[in-house]
Amino acid sequence: MATKSGPPIGPFPPDVETDEQKEEYDKLRRRVLWKMPYGLYVVGARDGERRNGMTLNWATQVSFEPKLIGISVEKDAFTHELITAGGVFSLNLLPQEERAAVRKFVKPVVVDPDGKTLNGYAYHDGRTGAPILDVAAAWVECEVRNPVDCGGHTFFIGEVVDAGFQADEETAVLRMEDTRMSYGG
């Protein structure tokens, strides 16, 4: 998960005027944002027979009633295309010992529909058809209720239509800080 870089993007405080000051302020702002705690997930997506899994860290519960989950997906990602067209997604919470799995889903996914694997990881279709990794400690499955344009990403708000555990409820799940990965800022 690489962080996009480029020219600093505002807004900037009034005392930040020169290009050099903007660059330094942008670096500071990124370091602060990288301190925000994040989970690390594999989001599953489906449209018809097309399926995908993608490493994702921008996810949160946004409502109790109804139960809503929000995920932010980069617009040029294949997963974005599938969620937009299919209207569903799964959020797979991996156990901490599955660090290698999230690295596998940073790269393009090889789908074996006959063997029911994504990048070699077994999956089953959830109630909506979104893939749920068999290795996931827990998962939620959502139907998109409200996509929100957020610049380079879309924040998909989905209603939880199914959820479950595939490991003991006390299993520690993977977080960004458990790896050397970073995405944000």
Predicted regions, residues:
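Basic, polyanion-binding surface patches
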Residues: 2-185
